[in-house]
Amino acid sequence: MKKLLVFLRDYKKESVLAPLFKLLEASFELFVPLVMAKIIDVGIGTGDNSYVLKMCGVLILLAFIGLTCAITAQYFAAKAAVGFATKLRHALFEHIQKLSFDELDRVGTSTLITRMTSDINQVQSGVNMVLRLFLRSPFIVFGAMVMAFTIDVKAALIFVVTIPALSVVVFGIMYVSIPLFKKVQSGLDEVLSLTRENLEGSRGIRAFRKEQEETAQFEQKNGLLTGMQLHVGKISALMNPLTYIIINFAIVALIWQGGLRVNVGAITQGEVVALVNYMSQILVELVKLANLIVTVNKSVACGNRIAQVLEMESSMEDGTLEIGENFSEQEMQGKKSVVSFEDVAMCYQAVSYTHLRAHETSQDL
C-alpha cells in the first residue's frame, strides 16, 4: 500500500490543507461546551437574557466557521482522493497492457477487472476518509480530555480511564479484522472468476450437461464468501455496542462525580454539562474512527492487491530495432516490409515447441 502513495505526489497541497481545515473545525467545536457552560452559569443562572442571546450568537458564529472549514476540507480531500484514484487507474491500465498472456492468465481477467474497478474505488474512499478524519478524530478525543482537565482535574480522571479502554476495543477489533478482509477479497475474486467462466462457457456447459456440477461449485464458493463476510461483519459490528457501553458507564460516573463536586462548590452545573458534552464528543468521534478503521482496513487490503499487479514484471520485451536509427529511410525505400521468423521457439507456461523453419514468414502461418 505504501508504494501507491507515489500517486499522491501531485496533490501534496490538497493532502496538507484538507487535514489542516479539519483541525480548525475541530478546534472551534471544542469551544462549544465552554460557551454552553457560560450560558447556563451566567446567563440562565442570573436571568440575564441579553447575555444568553449574545452567547447564542457566538455559538452560531462558531457553527458557521466550522461549516466553512468542513466544506473547504471536504473539497481538498475529494480533489486529492479522486486525482489519486485517476492516476492509479491509468497506471494500472497501462501496466496491464504490457503484461503477456501468460501473466494475464495466471492472475485472471476477473480479478484484474475487480482491481481496476471496485478495489480502486475502495482505495479512493479510504484516502478521502483518512484526509478528513485521521487527524480530526484523535485531535477531538485528546482535545476533549485536555479541556476536561481545565474544568476539573478529579472529574477529568474519568477520561483518563475511558480513552485507553476505548482504544483497546477499537484497535483490537482492527487487529483481528485486517486479515479477514484480505480473505474476503480473495473469496470475491474466486466467485467473480467462476461467474465469468460460466458465462463465457455456458454453451459448453449445456452441451455436456454440466449445469448441476457448475451450480454446486458456485454455491460452494458463494457460501464460503458469505460465511467470511458474515464472520468479519460480526467482529466489526462489536465496535459500536462495546464503545457505547464504555461511554455510557463513563457518563454515569461523570454525572455522579460531577454532582458530588457541585455540592462542595468545586465546579458549577454548567461545567458538569460541559464535561458530559465532551464525553459525548468523544463518543461521536470514536464512532467515526471505528468507521474509518473499517474503511482503511478494506482500502489497505485492496491497495495491496493493486500493488501486486503493479509489481508484476512482464515476460515480454520490446525490440530495439527502429527505422531511422538502425536503418535509414533511404535503405528502406523500394523494399517490401516482411516480418520473417527463423528458427523461432515458442512457449506458453509448461508447453513449448519449435515450429517455424528458416525463411518462413508470417504469410506461411
Model-predicted regions and their roles:
Residues M1-D10, L112:
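A short amphipathic helical element positioned immediately N-terminal to and/or at the very start
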Residues R9, S15-T72, F76, F149-K154, ...:
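Transmembrane helix-loop-helix hairpins at lipid-water interfaces of multipass membrane proteins
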Residues D10-K13, K98-D102, S118-L131, L135, ...:
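An intracellular "coupling" helix at the cytosolic face of ABC transporter transmembrane type-1 domains
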Residues E200, M279-A350:
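ABC transporter TMD-NBD coupling linker
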Residues T354-T361:
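Conserved small/polar residues in nucleotide/adenosyl-binding loops
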